[in-house]
């Protein structure tokens, strides 16, 4: 038997079955870096049309997690697929470097700026820390197989970038969008600074829920508004609030002008509440006996006076549209210093804007009753005062969603402070942004409604911060008028030049007289820094417009769904404020990473999946396959079990590639490829199937439908290849003569297929695709990533794909019949069987034209096709209209091909072989036409 084994063309390859990705991937990464593969990709696409995916900068703090991996791998898939499509698709990664998280980490080591360390030294430590974090994250991103200009990234703390932030501010000032104001802003007491909306998280919090009586100064003027002319007695407008600490700042009670309000007679006093809320309000107050004495619109009470519940001052009734009847009383406590709606109402009625709370969250010393008390602890004291004055109508605790600082996880407050704002309406910026939103392609399309809603409802953007580590606002304001210096734009450019040379310390170290001369004594130098969302938001200016390898606007921005209120928003706002257009053509959004049950990943919950552990255990390509396998438009689940399933899918893909490579061990494409006209029909079918599939895959890449690519490739490996083509060609590949047309036809097809297949994989399974590419025979390019989509297909005559689809279906039915026969113990392998297929007039010609090669379709020792009319009685008809009869072969088994044939032993020189094998090991080359 051994001598016949040596006559077979058994597969052989150096491409290992075991991937060992955690070992091979770092070696390949080092090889890419040593060869400068990214630079060579760029060189190969010089002069091609550009495609710009602009990277949203991750924060330079801490190791990467699975959300980072999801984002960067998705971007990498896009960049690589666009490169294969012929685009020059550079990828310039970025990092966001200023701001509080870095300050906090540095504070842990050296203390607060200005106490144990000077602000200048503190900023140097922040810069040093951010640089160290970039080094860590750069290595971790590269380990994921993400190609890019990693050693020329954009970094928001680079001097030239900081200078451009300042210049961007100048452009927005020039266009009339900056204004200063004393307005309520999100304020974190722990940070001691204003917060951007994107820095606010909403979490559940237990708060007091109280109703407070505001008594009418002159009940008669209220009662006269009701047609019933009720008798005069005390009258109360009750308010409901969950922030009792804001009551010292109350300046009005707000009603809705068009809501119907009811006059409730409760015996000793009247109450005016929204008609829709009467029942719930009276129940809350424990008042069961009452009557309604009249109705009136809210607008009729405008300017009437009420008594503040614990101060001597009187406050007016005012009107506004934000009042609802969803909860409360329909009468809204209004403190202009502590809320954006309250502030706007206050502005329209010129209410006093008095802020009783200091930056540290404590009431100022001049605040009657509550001086020095922290607002976070003041509620109990305020409730006691209200109760003592008999104005506390109801009190309970509720659990509700409340804004918290994203970093400290502590409840934040609204606090009126002097700040700088990008006005949304001063120069019609809001409408201009909305107009630009309509021009952008939003994927998924709900992104458009989401960001539109945010823009329509957002207040002015507070861009000033009271922090040490950030880009300064290089402004001078007049000490008396508080107006900006008349030469502000010129001064900003001079400061930008200084920062470009020496960094942000150039401003903080600057003596005002250096720029203003004698004028300096009349001006205050602003010490605020800018919101970090402005830092990253102007990357379209500092990066896209200042890097010659990039273009503005970008083709794509691609980030998580939280960036509709973050980077998408700040980028859009600044771009429109600076030059009137959106910075992107398409915005893609992916969901959050969650566990298998859709819950947020958390170390405390025990469902956290460590990225480094996944990569070290499974390899980056398994993680990349996980990314591609999910529909990123929704939340993306990850767990050890999900990764293991992807590892199983990976093995099927790898084994498909390995089979193709192993059967090309003696194939030289330069000399062994055969003419397309000589290809067997099955090989032509396989090539045509690949060409059609490639069109589908390219379309899916262009539409960013990566999960469809995963499904198509997996189906191709499992169905088209694994259970059909690769199974059928084994006999021909192994048993026919080495240089026969039949075998070289198969190898020619496999050569084209493995090259195309590997390029399909490359954007997703980058390391594995490169490994396959280096094993494919022939003179291939240095790296697969320099290639285009495969286009060296043989010119194939028309192949009837429907016929082969039908043959595939019949084969599946035959396999079922063979398995049933095997289960009954009548046969062992399929080669121990002979099959007769009885088919109708539609299917029969497709089978009979294969002639003797029909048995190779079923991988049985004998097969024939007959009209269905000849089918034995009782033989079941399958869904595809055929009947199948399986019998055990009575013939001897060929020692070489294992087929059981009547002619085994007829050749005396090779008594163990069938005549087909005798011919294949001698001068006779078996001829095949179809399979």
From Swiss-Prot:
A motif ('KMSKS' region) lies at residues 600-604. GO terms for molecular function: aminoacyl-tRNA deacylase activity; ATP binding; isoleucine-tRNA ligase activity; tRNA binding; zinc ion binding. It comes from the Bacteria. ATP binds at residue 603. It catalyses: tRNA(Ile) + L-isoleucine + ATP = L-isoleucyl-tRNA(Ile) + AMP + diphosphate. Its main location: cytoplasm. It is found in: Cytoplasm. A motif ('HIGH' region) lies at residues 58-68. InterPro entries: aa-tRNA-synth_I_CS, aa-tRNA-synth_Ia, Anticodon_Ile_BEm, Ile-tRNA-ligase, Ile-tRNA-ligase_type1, Ile-tRNA_ligase, M/V/L/I-tRNA-synth_anticd-bd, Rossmann-like_a/b/a_fold. The keyword Protein biosynthesis applies. One of its GO terms (cellular component) is cytosol. The keyword Ligase applies. Keywords: Aminoacyl-tRNA synthetase, ATP-binding, Cytoplasm, Ligase, Metal-binding, Nucleotide-binding, Protein biosynthesis, Zinc. Pfam families: Anticodon_1 (PF08264), tRNA-synt_1 (PF00133), zf-FPG_IleRS (PF06827). L-isoleucyl-5'-AMP binds at residue 559. Binds 1 zinc ion per subunit. Zn(2+) binds at residues 894, 897, 914, 917. Its cofactor is Zn(2+). GO terms for biological process: isoleucyl-tRNA aminoacylation. Its EC number is 6.1.1.5. PANTHER family: ISOLEUCINE--TRNA LIGASE, MITOCHONDRIAL, SOLEUCYL-TRNA SYNTHETASE. Catalyzes the attachment of isoleucine to tRNA(Ile). As IleRS can inadvertently accommodate and process structurally similar amino acids such as valine, to avoid such errors it has two additional distinct tRNA(Ile)-dependent editing activities. One activity is designated as 'pretransfer' editing and involves the hydrolysis of activated Val-AMP. The other activity is designated 'posttransfer' editing and involves deacylation of mischarged Val-tRNA(Ile). IleRS has two distinct active sites: one for aminoacylation and one for editing. The misactivated valine is translocated from the active site to the editing site, which sterically excludes the correctly activated isoleucine. The single editing site contains two valyl binding pockets, one specific for each substrate (Val-AMP or Val-tRNA(Ile)). Monomer. Belongs to the class-I aminoacyl-tRNA synthetase family. IleS type 1 subfamily. This is Isoleucine--tRNA ligase.
């Amino acid at each position: 038997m051994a001598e016949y084994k040596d006559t077979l063309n058994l597969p052989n390859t150096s491409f290992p079955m075991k991937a060992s990705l955690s070992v091979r991937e770092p070696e390949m990464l080092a090889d890419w870096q040593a060869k400068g593969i990214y630079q060579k990709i760029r060189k190969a696409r010089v002069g091609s049309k550009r495609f710009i995916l602009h990277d949203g900068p991750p924060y330079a703090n801490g190791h990467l997690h699975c959300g980072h991996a999801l984002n960067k791998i998705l971007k990498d898939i896009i960049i690589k697929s666009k490169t294969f499509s012929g685009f020059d698709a550079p990828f310039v990664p970025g990092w966001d470097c200023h701001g509080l998280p870095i300050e906090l980490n540095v504070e842990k080591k050296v203390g607060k700026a200005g106490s144990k360390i000077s602000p200048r030294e503190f900023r140097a430590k922040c810069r040093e820390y951010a640089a160290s974090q970039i080094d860590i994250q750069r290595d971790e991103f590269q380990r994921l197989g993400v190609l890019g200009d990693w050693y020329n990234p954009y970094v928001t703390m680079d001097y030239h970038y900081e200078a451009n932030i300042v210049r961007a501010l100048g452009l927005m000032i020039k266009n009339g969008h900056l204004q200063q104001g004393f307005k309520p802003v999100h304020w974190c007491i722990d940070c001691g600074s204003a917060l951007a909306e994107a820095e606010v998280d909403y979490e559940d919090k237990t708060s007091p829920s109280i109703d407070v009586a505001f008594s009418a100064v002159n009940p008669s003027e209220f009662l006269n508004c009701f047609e019933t002319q009720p008798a005069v007695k005390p009258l109360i407008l009750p308010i409901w609030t969950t922030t009792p600490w804001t009551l010292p700042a109350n300046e009005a009670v707000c009603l809705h002008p068009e809501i119907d309000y009811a006059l409730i007679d409760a015996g000793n006093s009247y109450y005016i509440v929204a008609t829709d809320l009467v029942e719930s309000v009276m129940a809350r107050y424990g008042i069961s006996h009452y009557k309604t004495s009249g109705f009136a619109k809210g607008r009729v009470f405008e300017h009437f006076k009420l008594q503040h519940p614990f101060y001597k001052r009187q406050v007016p009734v005012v009107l506004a549209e934000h009042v609802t009847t969803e909860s409360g009383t329909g009468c809204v406590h209004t403190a202009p210093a502590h809320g954006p709606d309250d502030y706007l109402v206050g502005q329209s009625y010129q209410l006093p804007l008095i802020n009783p709370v200091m930056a540290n969250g404590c009431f100022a010393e001049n605040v009657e009753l509550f001086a020095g008390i922290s607002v976070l602890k003041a509620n109990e004291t305020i409730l006691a005062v209200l109760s003592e004055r008999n104005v506390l109508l109801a009190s309970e605790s509720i659990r509700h969603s409340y804004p918290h600082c994203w970093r400290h996880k502590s409840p934040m407050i609204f606090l009126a402070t002097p700040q700088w704002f990008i006005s949304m309406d001063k120069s019609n910026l809001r409408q201009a942004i909305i107009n630009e939103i309509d021009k952008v392609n939003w994927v998924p399309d709900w992104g458009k409604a989401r960001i539109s809603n945010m823009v329509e409802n957002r207040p002015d953007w507070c861009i000033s911060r009271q922090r040490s580590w950030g880009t300064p606002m290089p402004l001078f304001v007049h000490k008396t008028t508080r107006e900006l210096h008349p030469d502000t734009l010129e001064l900003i450019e001079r400061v930008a030049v200084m920062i470009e040379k020496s960094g942000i310390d150039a401003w903080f170290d600057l003596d005002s007289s250096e720029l203003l001369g004698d004028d300096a004594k009349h001006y205050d130098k602003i010490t605020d820094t800018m919101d970090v969302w402005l830092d990253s938001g102007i990357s379209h200016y500092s990066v896209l417009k200042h890097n010659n390898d990039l273009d503005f606007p970008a083709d794509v921005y691609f980030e998580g769904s939280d960036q509709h209120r973050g980077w998408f928003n700040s980028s859009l706002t600044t771009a429109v404020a600076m030059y009137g257009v959106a910075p992107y053509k398409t915005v893609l959004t992916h969901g959050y990473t969650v566990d298998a049950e859709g819950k947020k990943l958390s170390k405390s919950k025990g469902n956290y999946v460590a990225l480094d552990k996944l990569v070290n255990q499974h390899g980056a390509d398994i993680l990349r396959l996980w990314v591609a396998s999910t529909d990123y438009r929704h939340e993306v689940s990850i767990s050890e079990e999900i990764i293991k399933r992807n590892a199983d899918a990976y093995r099927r893909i790898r084994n498909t590639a390995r089979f193709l490579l192993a059967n090309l061990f003696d194939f030289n494409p330069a000399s062994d490829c055969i003419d397309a006209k000589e290809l067997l029909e099955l090989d032509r079918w396989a090539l045509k199937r690949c060409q059609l599939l490639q069109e589908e895959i390219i379309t899916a890449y262009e539409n960013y439908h990566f999960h469809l690519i995963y499904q198509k490739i997996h189906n191709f490996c499992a169905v088209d290849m694994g259970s059909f083509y690769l199974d059928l060609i084994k006999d021909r590949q192994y048993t026919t003569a080495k240089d026969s047309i039949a075998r070289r036809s198969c190898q020619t097809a496999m050569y084209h297929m493995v090259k195309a297949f590997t390029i399909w994989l490359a954007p997703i399974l980058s390391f594995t695709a490169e490994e396959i590419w280096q094993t494919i025979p022939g003179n291939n390019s240095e790296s697969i990533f320099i290639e285009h989509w495969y286009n060296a297909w043989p010119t194939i005559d028309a192949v009837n794909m429907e016929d082969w689809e039908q043959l595939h279906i019949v084969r599946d039915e035959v396999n079922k019949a063979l398995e049933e026969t095997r289960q009954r113990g009548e046969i062992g392998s399929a080669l121990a069987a002979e099959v007769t297929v009885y088919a109708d007039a539609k299917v029969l010609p497709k089978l009979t034209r294969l002639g003797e090669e029909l048995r190779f379709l079923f991988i049985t020792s004998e097969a024939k096709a007959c009209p269905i009319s000849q089918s034995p009685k009782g033989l079941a008809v399958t869904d595809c209209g055929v009947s199948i009869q399986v019998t055990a072969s009575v013939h001897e088994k060929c020692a070489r091909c294992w087929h059981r044939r009547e002619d085994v032993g007829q050749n005396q020189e090779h008594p163990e072989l069938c005549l087909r094998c005798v011919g294949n090991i001698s001068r006779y080359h078996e001829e095949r036409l179809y399979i």
